[in-house]
């Protein structure tokens, strides 16, 4: 079957923003104008097309990235709507991994906000070209120029206006296109229709000056056009557009457009900018992959061997497990087999679906550039590579996700619900790489871990709604870690030889701090002092002991262990004996290697009216917070940024509401681990040890 659209006519884009900047409404309007939906849904009414989970409809925020396909001016646009709440940063991360371009939505009054910085940084990591859409131009305090300036000052982004607003706040009623030097006005409150108009005389000089700024900024990326500008020659509109496109594709130049999505003003022009300036799959560099540990490139084409990346797994109430994937190369037909080169497993592709939020259309095949979903894959999880059954087993560059920082104990309200709870947790953890679940061996409790309180609230809610399991929830617990601060050489022995088959394991290990490098095991055994078959069990013994810690029962991180000596017994040595010997060595080393407790430190941004700033700063300081920055916003609010231990932030939203009469908001996300102050560390260790004794 031939392609409906050439690869050069594809646009795989994401809509990204701070919570409440209007990105779901913006996506709704794109779908409305491109003919995908016939009735507009409003987020505040709980009927948005893209927010299809019950929790999203109730809370008016986007939790999971819904995918949809739309068409505009002979281009196919695959859109992923991403969450703006930091607890769901993983959704943004995995979406950006498979997108070619993005629209960053800003609030015209607030400009760049805390979560904007986070998603912008993620997009920069993946080198995703962006256009900036300044939304809510009709809002009180809207300031287009200040919003553009905030991208430069706060994000370090080379943002340049390609449009200029006619009026602002309640007087916003038109847009000047700086490329074509034409103007458009709108009909009434909800602007279904656009009308051409002359550029208002009071804005003509401003528009000319801004057009020249735009031309000079874009010309920096095209020597030929730069020469034309320097010589004062005319640059025709097609050349001008091509120059802006070329600049945008470098990810170092960001065209800025404006509008108000809620009232339909500027949305069509924003879609035009997506089509004109964001990349097709052919415009981005080839994707990095590995074949037999050698780096190779995967070039976008239908003709090559099939290669795709699974970027999301979710449970659909009607079809079961859905795996979303982006095709980078080749063609996939329904009914065929693929090979999961990450898991080394064969999978059958029974059905292929194209998604529109939670509606689905069955398709026969998908090709390079497509984003689709497969039904019922058994082994594939987020970040896995899928290749043709008989293709070279390339593995695409992996996706990296942050570790969970907060935990809660769960208990089903009835024992009969245990099985349903287990099934629900298994499915939810398959969907979300930042959600973990395990059973505490000492207490028998089911523990869930995630990125924040809202993240875990949603999990508990989904257990109830989707799996019919009501649970009692314990108080949130901080995910502490243990690490070492000194080096030491330690002997570990596990020797039992008293008749019959004995046990003999004997090792010498050197432990060293391994800051930010995780666990590293080095084998320096020479001369066969320990046979090769026992080296892996020694490493395994250390890993198992590190998982439960040696100080207070928390996982250990950032340790280098070098095996440099030991001995063995011809008859009595075994894998188990060496595992135990290694574990004993680490336990014995506890005091010698300066084991300490680490606590998660959060990056906190609080937005408050300036008259409450002193109270907020004082309160954060009492919570052991270090104030890193304060910034005055145009609307009279202040952003206070601080690094605060997670343990001090429980219940902060209630406290902030009370302190600011409900006018303050905050965002927080994990930043790093830091050594606990001794008095707090001692208290935690004491409490954990008492707990453990009570349970013995």
From Swiss-Prot:
<dbReference type="Pfam" id="PF14492">
    <property type="entry name" value="EFG_III"/>
</dbReference>
<keyword id="KW-0963">Cytoplasm</keyword>
<dbReference type="InterPro" id="IPR047872">
    <property type="entry name" value="EFG_IV"/>
</dbReference>
<keyword id="KW-0342">GTP-binding</keyword>
<dbReference type="InterPro" id="IPR027417">
    <property type="entry name" value="P-loop_NTPase"/>
</dbReference>
<dbReference type="InterPro" id="IPR000640">
    <property type="entry name" value="EFG_V-like"/>
</dbReference>
<dbReference type="Pfam" id="PF03764">
    <property type="entry name" value="EFG_IV"/>
</dbReference>
<feature type="binding site">
    <location>
        <begin position="17"/>
        <end position="24"/>
    </location>
    <ligand>
        <name>GTP</name>
    </ligand>
</feature>
<comment type="similarity">
    <text>Belongs to the TRAFAC class translation factor GTPase superfamily. Classic translation factor GTPase family. EF-G/EF-2 subfamily.</text>
</comment>
<dbReference type="GO" id="GO:0005525">
    <property type="term" value="F:GTP binding"/>
</dbReference>
<dbReference type="GO" id="GO:0003746">
    <property type="term" value="F:translation elongation factor activity"/>
</dbReference>
<dbReference type="InterPro" id="IPR031157">
    <property type="entry name" value="G_TR_CS"/>
</dbReference>
<dbReference type="InterPro" id="IPR005225">
    <property type="entry name" value="Small_GTP-bd"/>
</dbReference>
<dbReference type="GO" id="GO:0005737">
    <property type="term" value="C:cytoplasm"/>
</dbReference>
<dbReference type="InterPro" id="IPR041095">
    <property type="entry name" value="EFG_II"/>
</dbReference>
<dbReference type="InterPro" id="IPR009022">
    <property type="entry name" value="EFG_III"/>
</dbReference>
<keyword id="KW-0648">Protein biosynthesis</keyword>
<dbReference type="InterPro" id="IPR009000">
    <property type="entry name" value="Transl_B-barrel_sf"/>
</dbReference>
<protein>
    <recommendedName>
        <fullName>Elongation factor G</fullName>
    </recommendedName>
</protein>
<feature type="domain" description="tr-type G">
    <location>
        <begin position="8"/>
        <end position="282"/>
    </location>
</feature>
<dbReference type="GO" id="GO:0032790">
    <property type="term" value="P:ribosome disassembly"/>
</dbReference>
<dbReference type="InterPro" id="IPR014721">
    <property type="entry name" value="Ribsml_uS5_D2-typ_fold_subgr"/>
</dbReference>
<keyword id="KW-0251">Elongation factor</keyword>
<keyword id="KW-0547">Nucleotide-binding</keyword>
<feature type="binding site">
    <location>
        <begin position="81"/>
        <end position="85"/>
    </location>
    <ligand>
        <name>GTP</name>
    </ligand>
</feature>
<dbReference type="GO" id="GO:0003924">
    <property type="term" value="F:GTPase activity"/>
</dbReference>
<dbReference type="Pfam" id="PF00009">
    <property type="entry name" value="GTP_EFTU"/>
</dbReference>
<dbReference type="InterPro" id="IPR000795">
    <property type="entry name" value="T_Tr_GTP-bd_dom"/>
</dbReference>
<dbReference type="InterPro" id="IPR005517">
    <property type="entry name" value="Transl_elong_EFG/EF2_IV"/>
</dbReference>
<dbReference type="InterPro" id="IPR035647">
    <property type="entry name" value="EFG_III/V"/>
</dbReference>
<feature type="binding site">
    <location>
        <begin position="135"/>
        <end position="138"/>
    </location>
    <ligand>
        <name>GTP</name>
    </ligand>
</feature>
<dbReference type="InterPro" id="IPR035649">
    <property type="entry name" value="EFG_V"/>
</dbReference>
<dbReference type="Pfam" id="PF00679">
    <property type="entry name" value="EFG_C"/>
</dbReference>
<dbReference type="InterPro" id="IPR004540">
    <property type="entry name" value="Transl_elong_EFG/EF2"/>
</dbReference>
<dbReference type="Pfam" id="PF03144">
    <property type="entry name" value="GTP_EFTU_D2"/>
</dbReference>
<comment type="function">
    <text>Catalyzes the GTP-dependent ribosomal translocation step during translation elongation. During this step, the ribosome changes from the pre-translocational (PRE) to the post-translocational (POST) state as the newly formed A-site-bound peptidyl-tRNA and P-site-bound deacylated tRNA move to the P and E sites, respectively. Catalyzes the coordinated movement of the two tRNA molecules, the mRNA and conformational changes in the ribosome.</text>
</comment>
<dbReference type="InterPro" id="IPR004161">
    <property type="entry name" value="EFTu-like_2"/>
</dbReference>
<dbReference type="InterPro" id="IPR020568">
    <property type="entry name" value="Ribosomal_Su5_D2-typ_SF"/>
</dbReference>
């Amino acid at each position: 079957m031939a392609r409906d659209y050439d690869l050069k006519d594809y646009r795989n884009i994401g809509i990204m923003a701070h919570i409440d900047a209007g990105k779901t409404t913006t996506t709704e309007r794109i779908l409305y104008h491109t003919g995908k939906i016939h009735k507009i849904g409003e987020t505040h009414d709980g009927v948005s097309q893209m927010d299809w989970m019950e929790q999203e409809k109730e809370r008016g925020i986007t939790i999971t990235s819904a995918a949809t396909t739309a068409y505009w001016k002979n281009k196919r646009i695959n859109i992923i709507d991403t969450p703006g709440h930091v607890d769901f940063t993983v959704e943004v991360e995995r979406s950006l991994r498979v997108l070619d371009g993005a629209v960053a939505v800003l609030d015209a009054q607030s400009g760049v906000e805390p979560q904007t910085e986070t998603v912008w940084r993620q997009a920069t990591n993946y080198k995703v070209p962006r256009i900036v859409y300044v939304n809510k131009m009709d809002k009180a305090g809207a300031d287009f120029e200040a919003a553009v300036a905030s991208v430069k000052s706060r994000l370090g982004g080379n943002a340049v206006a390609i449009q200029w607003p006619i009026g602002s706040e309640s007087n916003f009623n038109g847009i000047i296109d700086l490329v074509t030097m034409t103007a458009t006005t709108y009909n009434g409150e909800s602007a279904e229709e656009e009308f051409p108009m002359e550029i208002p005389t009071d804005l003509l000089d401003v528009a000319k000056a801004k057009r020249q700024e735009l031309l000079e900024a874009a010309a920096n990326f095209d020597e030929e056009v730069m020469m034309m500008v320097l010589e004062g020659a005319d640059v025709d509109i097609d050349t001008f557009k091509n120059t802006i496109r070329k600049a945008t594709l470098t990810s170092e130049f960001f065209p800025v457009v404006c509008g108000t999505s809620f009232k339909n003003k500027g949305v069509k022009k924003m879609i035009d900018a997506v089509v004109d300036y964001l990349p097709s799959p052919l415009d981005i560099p080839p994707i990095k992959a590995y074949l037999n540990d050698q780096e190779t490139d995967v070039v976008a084409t239908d003709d090559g061997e099939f290669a795709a990346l699974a970027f999301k797994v979710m449970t659909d109430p009607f079809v079961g497990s859905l795996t979303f994937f982006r095709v980078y190369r080749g063609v996939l037909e329904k009914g065929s087999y693929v090979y999961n080169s990450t898991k080394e497993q064969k999978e059958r592709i029974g059905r292929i679906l194209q998604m529109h939020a939670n509606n689905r259309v069955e398709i026969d095949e998908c090709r390079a550039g497509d984003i689709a979903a497969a039904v019922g894959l058994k082994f594939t999880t987020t970040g896995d590579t899928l290749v043709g059954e008989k293709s070279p087993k390339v593995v695409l560059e992996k996706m990296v996700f942050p570790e969970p920082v907060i935990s809660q104990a769960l208990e089903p309200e009835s024992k009969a619900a245990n099985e349903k709870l287990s099934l629900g947790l298994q499915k939810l953890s398959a969907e979300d790489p930042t959600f973990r679940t395990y059973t505490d061996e000492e207490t028998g409790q089911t523990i869930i871990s995630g990125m924040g309180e809202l993240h875990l609230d949603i999990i508990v809610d989904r257990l109830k709604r989707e799996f019919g399991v009501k649970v009692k929830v314990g108080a949130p617990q901080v995910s502490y870690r243990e690490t070492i601060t000194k080096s030491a050489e330690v002997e570990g022995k596990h020797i039992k030889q008293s008749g019959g088959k004995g046990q003999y394991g004997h090792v010498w290990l050197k432990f060293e701090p391994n800051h930010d490098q995780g666990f590293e095991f080095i084998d320096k055994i020479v001369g066969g002092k320990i046979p090769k078959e026992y080296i892996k069990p020694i490493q395994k013994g250390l890993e198992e002991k590190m998982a439960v810690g040696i100080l207070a029962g928390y996982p250990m991180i950032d340790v280098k262990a070098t095996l440099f000596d030991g001995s063995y017994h011809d008859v009595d040595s075994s894998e188990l004996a060496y595992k135990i010997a290694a574990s004993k060595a680490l336990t014995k080393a506890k005091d010698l290697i300066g084991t300490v407790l680490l606590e998660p430190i959060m990056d906190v941004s609080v937005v408050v009216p300036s008259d409450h700033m002193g109270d907020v700063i004082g309160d954060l300081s009492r919570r052991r917070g270090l104030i890193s920055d304060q910034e005055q916003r145009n609307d009279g609010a202040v952003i206070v940024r601080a690094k605060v231990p997670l343990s001090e932030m429980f219940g902060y939203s209630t406290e902030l509401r009370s302190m600011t009469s409900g006018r303050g908001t905050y965002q927080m996300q994990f930043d790093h681990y830091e050594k606990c102050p001794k008095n707090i560390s001692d208290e935690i260790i004491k409490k954990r040890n008492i707990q453990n004794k009570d349970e013995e």
